[in-house]
Amino acid sequence: IAMDLAIEENCKELHKKVKDIDFLINNAGFGDCGDFTKTDLDKEIAMIHTNIIAYHILTKLYLIDMKKVNRGKILNVASIAGFMPGPLMSTYYATKSYVVRLSESIREELRKENSKVQISILCPGPVNTNFNNVANVKFHMREANSYNVAKFAIDKLLKGKFYIIPG
């Protein structure tokens, strides 16, 4: 199902169309690079919609479903960027921090309820994807192979790990 998840109604429509899932992998997102006062505001608003609001809506709707049957796993793809400030990528780093903090908070709620529903966060460094082209950024460190990161993430998710940090 191809949908623009920056549009809130599409997130809700996706949830209506796709039910009874055991796994939710929230992996939509993009970044942008540049001085905060010079980056494009409309692009940043779209980034916030994709990187925060879509994650929030999908996590909430599917978590409600999963809690009803007391099973399921949610993997929110964040970034190591979620743990630190990010000059020249301020909005992106802030969105990933939101994903980390939301996931940590939900994890604590699930723990207190003794729920069998699991939430985890994948926090990779640079990965060899189209992200760099969209974000107008070039990393000066080796990028991880996307297949290896995905395989690592699924393995750790199935083992019940919360923080999944490749490398």
Predicted regions and their residues:
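The beta1-alpha1 cofactor-binding region of Rossmann-like NAD(H)/NADP(H)-dependent oxidoreductases
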Residues: 2-13, 41
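Conserved NAD(P)H cofactor-binding loop of Rossmann-fold oxidoreductase domains
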Residues: 27-32
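Substrate-binding pocket helix/loop in short-chain dehydrogenase/reductase
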Residues: 35-37, 43-48
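Active-site helix of classical SDR
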Residues: 59, 95
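Residue(s) in the substrate-gating loop at a strand-loop-helix junction
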Residues: 79
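Active-site loop immediately N-terminal to the catalytic Tyr-X3-Lys motif
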Residues: 86-90
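SDR active-site lid
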Residues: 101, 108-167
